Amino acid sequence: MIHYEYPLSERIRTLLRLEDLFERFDAHAMSSAAQAHHAALLTLFEMAEVAARADLKSDLLQELDRQKAVLTALRGNPHVQSATLEQVLAAIDAAHDGMYQLPGKVGNHLREDDWLMAVKQRAAIPGGMCEFDLPSYHYWLHQPAEQRVGQLQAWGAPFASIRAAVGIVLGLLRDSGQPESQEAAKGHYQRMLESRNPQLIRVTLADHVPCVPEISANKYMLNIRFVHAGVGAPRGCASESIQFELTFCTL
């Protein structure tokens, strides 16, 4: 199954972007190849840019406080697994404490490193990171892989508390919805949202369905158009009916 997610607020959009960047950074940093570490460093710069949003830190702290209050009220509920609940509450406390102790904006440790900022400046220029542009970077790429991995991990470590908070909030958000089986006649699906106020819409398709959903939504209406996918496929709406799962997620 393939999940397609559509955020309905800038806050959730930012969290999804960060989640994607964190996963991409890990994938590149775990490699031993120099070019993978080049990609990891570029991803690190993106992480810092997205995480530097002025209200991100305060938003996450407030959301963690809110979720802790909601979940704490479930203690003693016979329908809730107490061990799982306590694990989530402990994770919320750890992420909250870690974020609260972060000085200034997330990613400031990168901005204060002159070497990294010189690399970042050249990275903004197409083809601007050749060895004659940045000989010190060329030297770094030729250091032992273990040394580069250690430095990448050190540069990524200050994002740990933000990453944990993002994972908790998105995990709770995704778990808040119940999938509904739906059908898009001739590739189109439309639905009034009525009293729903989703923060995230998830569309789930079977792997073999050669279509992707194009989603548009506001607080009143949801429209999904399934279009042909694949490299070289003619762009257009599917003519057949599409079976899919639809999930509305709200915290």
From Swiss-Prot:
**Gene Ontology cellular component list:** cell division site; cytoplasm
Origin, by domain of life?
A: Bacteria
Q: Where in the cell is it found?
A: Cytoplasm
Keyword annotations for this protein?
A: Cell cycle, Cell division, Cytoplasm, Septation
Q: Does the keyword Cell cycle apply?
A: yes
Answer yes or no on keyword Cytoplasm.
Answer: yes
Main localization of the protein described in the UniProt heading: cytoplasm
**What processes does the entry annotate via GO biological process terms?**
division septum assembly; FtsZ-dependent cytokinesis
One Pfam entry for this protein is ZapD
What the record says about family reads: Belongs to the ZapD family.
Query: What is its quaternary makeup?
Result: Interacts with FtsZ.
User: What role does this protein play?
Assistant: Cell division factor that enhances FtsZ-ring assembly. Directly interacts with FtsZ and promotes bundling of FtsZ protofilaments, with a reduction in FtsZ GTPase activity.
Please identify the protein, giving its name as recorded.
Cell division protein ZapD
Q: Which organism is it from?
A: Thiobacillus denitrificans (strain ATCC 25259 / T1)
Q: Which gene encodes it?
A: zapD
